[in-house]
Structure formats: structure tokens, C-alpha cells
């Protein structure tokens, strides 16, 4: 059995705690870019915060833990109002996805409930005209002379409205006129470099229901967006049209039995995508089979004994998030109580089922009354698919091993960050700690604060580094192998 990784707290970005968290600063989206050098964080106020990893030698000598610093922040979405439906459209960022880098510019997709935007983020040099530099001697054809000695055979004429004048004669008489000897030439210099974000494309008026997912294709040119009943295929360079690839809306809405909860493209096969439903099923679609993929290529569903069904069965079986492993071999799904790992070649049952918080089953009535039972927890895998991450209540986050029963439980809290504090900007803070992981058996349901929850998480594409969002704060944890 492999030794568990030694997870340590690395950094935190955000506010001062749940009690001080304003609604606009709550974090609903976190995403690493393809290199892992950037982290994008979206908040409920429509802003996107970008963090950049530092690679300076001095920081690496002091600590082996990775360090991220503030890079940029911009307003992605504004609150809107749909006058046709008399509905307010929140500015909250639902999802963020990084696009392939082009030249020195970063590109990313952001979406709220209705509108998707493609942003270009780049470093812009602000130039200014510096103080004029004084140069002695006349200028001819752009060259500067250090003195006023010229060849006798070289005569230069200048023309104006009064006619031609011999410039050599003027130069001989310039000893009494310093204004002709001293030329002030302005110089253009770079004053500063600022990070600028500009919207390149706006994709809108395609979704009648709230957008819950966006996923970039492996071809780097297309992506899908899904709402409760439809999935659309877009081209990044065309925002005037899209193609509907899945439509589960019935003719009569009274016959509606399920909704789409999440969708994602295959990491390597550009024609394959999957989507999950509120019935607990995962369906695989193939764009080569037909333009409209209502007839799925595969369906992943686990049989449930009818005798075990209850009033809450359908609610807790609804899948809140799905992820492909980076090689496309496995599918990770999360519902309210469990985390399931599926083999793409085996549809009838998952290869691994993990009970996240089985101790909450007796409290389902209470969770239904306070609406916690409808919370949507995200999940993710590491770069080789051997580690799985998801969140829970009381700001707990669980890291599971695919090949064993290892469960590393960490608590994302401010109490873990008292040892060292360093202010980076007015909007961010960096803290370090060595708090030991919590044992899962030490968790007591009666002591759990259900207002504290880690719903959103992301894993570095190459390293053992995770980012989780709790209220208005982002926590970073890094791990090393025990020796």
C-alpha cells in the first residue's frame, strides 16, 4: 500500500472569515490553467481574480511550498434584467475555463446564468514621452554631430517661405546663438506594465435556462455549454450561432422527469462528451453518430434496490459534478452523499464508491428543511487519476486514494493560519501553517456547522497542489511524499 501524501497548508486568499463574508465576495468558481502557473477565481459579484505562481529562487529556498501572488482582477459580468421574462440575471460567475495560450496572452471563458464571455488577458506597456534630451551640434539626416565642424565642400540648404538659405553659413554664425546648437529630442520610454483584460467574444441569447457548465474541447476551437435541458456546441471564434447537440425538453413540461446537472468534453477525443442528470445517471454522447445526441452512446447507472428508496432518494442521488481523468479512462461523479469512480468501459456499476458523510443520513430531514440537501459539491482528480478530491460541511475537504481506503481529511479554516501572516495586497493575504490533517472518525455530526462548506475545488494539472473555496476564501494545500 502506498504511503499517504503529507499535505500542508500553503496559502489563503480572501476575506477575514465567514462572519465577515459579504455576499458579493463568495467564491463559486476556481480553475487552474493548463500549466498550473495561473489560478482564476470567480466571485458572486461578477469579478474574476487571477493569481500567478512565482518562480524566484529566494522564495524556493525559504520554503518548498509553491507560492502564488496577485496578478490581476477584472469585472467579468454585471447584473442584468430580462424584460421579456421579468427576471433578474445575477452577475455571479458560475464557471471559469482556461483556453490555450496565444503568444503572450492568456484566454479564458467565464459565464453567469445566461451569458458566456471570452476574455483576453495580457500585459500592456504604458509608454510616455520622457524629459527631452539635449544634444549639442546640428542634425542632418537624423545624425547628431558632436561639434559644428563641417567639410568645406559640404553645403546644406534649408528651405522655408522666404527662400533658400545656406546652412553652413548659419552654422558658422551659431557661436552667438546656442539655440541652434542645442537640440532637444524627446524620447519614448516604458513607464509601467499593467495587466489588461478585454472581452474578445460574448456568447449570449442561446440558453433559456440557467447555464451550469462550460467545457473546452481538446481541439482548442470549440466548447460546450449546458443548462437544465439543453447542451450547445460553440466555436470560440463565432458568437452569432451555436449547434444544439442535446435537448431533453419534453413537448409537455409536465412530463419532465430529469434535468441536466453538468457536462464535460473528453480530454483527448474531441468527438466525445458526457453529461449527468438529476436521476443519478451519466450519459456519453458521440458527435460522430448524429448532429443531435439525444440517443446516448453509453449510460452509466447503478442499480438501486426499490426497497431502499425513500422520500429523499431522488434528491440525494442527483449528480452535482462529473470529471474525466486526464487520460479519459475514468469518470468521477459526486452526489450529495457519495463519490463514485467509473471505468469508461464498465457501465453497470462504479469501480469504487466512497461514502463522503454517511453520518448525515439520520439528519436528512433537517438538511431538507434548511435546504442544505440541495448543495452542489464539486469533485476533481489529480494529474494521474490516483487521487480524488471533494468537499464537505464544516469546511472539511477529503482526499481519497483510488487504489486503497486512504482518506485524508483537512479543515479549511482560519484557525490553521495563525503562525505567519504576510500582506500581499489590500485584497489578499498569505498565511502559512503546519496543522495536522483531521481523522475522518473524529467528525461528529452534532458538532458540524452546516453554514461552512467547501463546495468548489480544483487540482493542479501537474503537481500535488489543490485549491478549495469556502465562503469568500480560497485555500491552497500542497503535498510531498513521505519518506
Curated annotation (Swiss-Prot):
Pfam families linked to this entry: WD40 (PF00400)
UniProt-listed GO biological process terms: myosin filament assembly
Gene3D superfamilies in the cross-refs: YVTN repeat-like/Quinoprotein amine dehydrogenase (2.130.10.10)
Annotated WD repeat ranges: 22-61, 88-129, 206-244, 255-295, 314-352, 369-410, 449-483
GO cellular component, one term: protein phosphatase type 2A complex
Repeat listed as a keyword: yes
Disordered, as annotated region: 132-152, 421-443
Key words of the record: Cytoplasm, Cytoskeleton, Repeat, WD repeat
Compartments where located: Cytoplasm, Cytosol; Cytoplasm, Cytoskeleton, Microtubule organizing center, Centrosome
Biased composition (Basic and acidic residues): 433-443
GO molecular function: myosin phosphatase regulator activity; protein phosphatase regulator activity
Source organism, top-level taxon: Eukaryota
Function: The B regulatory subunit might modulate substrate selectivity and catalytic activity, and might also direct the localization of the catalytic enzyme to a particular subcellular compartment.
Subunit field text: PP2A consists of a trimeric holoenzyme, composed of a 37 kDa catalytic subunit (C subunit) and a 65 kDa constant regulatory subunit (A subunit), that associates with a variety of regulatory subunits (B subunit) such as phr2AB (B55) and psrA (B56 homolog). The trimer may partially dissociates into a core 'AC' dimer equally active compared to the trimer.
Similarity comment: Belongs to the phosphatase 2A regulatory subunit B family.
Name under which the protein is recorded: Serine/threonine-protein phosphatase 2A regulatory subunit phr2AB
